[in-house]
Amino acid sequence: MTQFAADKPYIVKDMSLAKWGRIEFDMAEIEMPGLMALREEYKDSQPLKGARIAGSLHMTVQTAILIETLTALGAEVRWASCNIFSTQDHAAAAIAETGVPVFATKGETLEEYWDYADAIFHWPDGETANMILDDGGDATMYLILGEKAENDPSVLNHPKSEEETFLFAQIKKRIAATPGWFAKAKAAIQGVSEETTTGVMRLYQMQKRGELPFPAINVNDSVTKSKFDNRYGCRESLVDAIRRGTDVMMAGKKALVFGYGDVGKGSAESLAGAGARVYVTEIDPICALQACMDGFEVVRAEDVIGEMDIFVTATGNKDILTVDHMRAMKDMAIVCNIGHFDNEIQVESLKNYQWTNVKPQVDLVNFPEGHRIILLSEGRLVNLGNATGHPSFVMSASFTNQTLAQIELWTKGENYTNEVYILPKHLDEKVAALHLDKLGAKLTVLSDEQADYIGVPQHGPFKAEHYRY
């Protein structure tokens, strides 16, 4: 048995699933026009030639189309999932069959998760990655924390969660096996593109502290990501996940959505579309007012906790649903999270109670008061744990942004310092334009006089950087 996952060519659940994965890839490509257009546009110039990309993002069918786009543009890629439950095993097998090293299985342990995160940085010839494509910031954090530990081992002395216990153990294991590796690996990185709200928050925190070691592109805040993937994606995938997990009818049920950002908005719309009566909690008066204007009642959780049938956290914060909240819920209330990390719900504290596993990613938690809750995906991303995530079309927009961000950082690295950037408006509009034909949309074209009148180029960009959409 090898010491590290990195020593193996790949780790997937079952290579016999590859044929099934390839069939789904063929279907997904039809729904992902942005990525397919980039393959055609850049097939000759190969802008990612020489890039060694460490990818940490849900290993789904849609991600497979992203991976094959990156390699079609010249990149070498190694991949792991950014969530222990989100891998689609047939997709992982089909990618491994192409020769791309993949380290991902649905239901992997936390120990395996961090071993796989390590594996994406190691090339067989001894080279390390020179680019990161991240979702949630775990791959980026692994390198940065690892280098800190090389200089000061005490930073690993006091893990604050089960997750940190395994992360710290993996870092110690790598330092013991390859002293100085983290400093070398971090120094080789030319840039990172970050997919999601939580990971972007980590990057901005590092920038504020002066600790960001390489340029970063915030893909999440591209309009064609956050206003589409986060909202319209969740609008389709949340109810899908709850239905697959519970078979509960949502019409007439009371649902409480924590947070009314883009993900919360999509989640509330998803539940309302299924006939649920939706309530919202918020800390931000602007988002709270938006929720009211959209027809949702804004409440405090403690005032309604015993009335609700369904609870969905979507804040990106921690300790949103506490054990005390869950002890006060009605019998068989459904509890789930659609934010990136599992600490929105105090799942670790629930380990003190009796659990009954119903089926994969569905558990009953029994409280001494005599009631139970239905916990989905152990508090991790419900739409990827209990279902298959967002539809291919909306992910095409997100992943087209990711590909453009990788090209930008790799080919124009000299233009970027160690700060967090957003893709320019003309690329955001390009991503949108690449998806219009699929929907049969036809743009109106400004006349020269009209363009002059409103002070924009005839063919865009059409909005100022501060425009909010």
Curated annotation (Swiss-Prot):
InterPro entries: Adenosylhomocyst_ase-like_sf (IPR042172), Adenosylhomocysteinase-like (IPR000043), Ado_hCys_hydrolase_NAD-bd (IPR015878), NAD(P)-bd_dom_sf (IPR036291), S-Ado-L-homoCys_hydrolase_CS (IPR020082)
Binding site for NAD(+): 196-198, 230, 259-264, 282, 317, 338-340, 383
Cofactor note: Binds 1 NAD(+) per subunit.
Listed GO MF terms: adenosylhomocysteinase activity
Compartment list: Cytoplasm
Alphabetized UniProt keyword annotations: Cytoplasm, Hydrolase, NAD, One-carbon metabolism
Residue positions binding substrate: 60, 135, 195, 225, 229
GO cellular component terms, A-Z: cytosol
Single Gene Ontology BP annotation: one-carbon metabolic process
Cofactor(s) recorded in Swiss-Prot or TrEMBL: NAD(+)
EC number: 3.13.2.1
Catalytically driven reaction(s): S-adenosyl-L-homocysteine + H2O = L-homocysteine + adenosine
Primary subcellular site in the record, as a coarse category: cytoplasm
Annotated pathway: Amino-acid biosynthesis; L-homocysteine biosynthesis; L-homocysteine from S-adenosyl-L-homocysteine: step 1/1
Purpose: May play a key role in the regulation of the intracellular concentration of adenosylhomocysteine.
NCBIfam families: ahcY (TIGR00936), PRK05476.2-3 (NF004005)
UniProt xrefs under HAMAP family: AdoHcyase
Family that this chain belongs to: Belongs to the adenosylhomocysteinase family.
Name of this chain's protein: Adenosylhomocysteinase
Classification of source organism: Bacteria, Pseudomonadati, Pseudomonadota, Alphaproteobacteria, Maricaulales
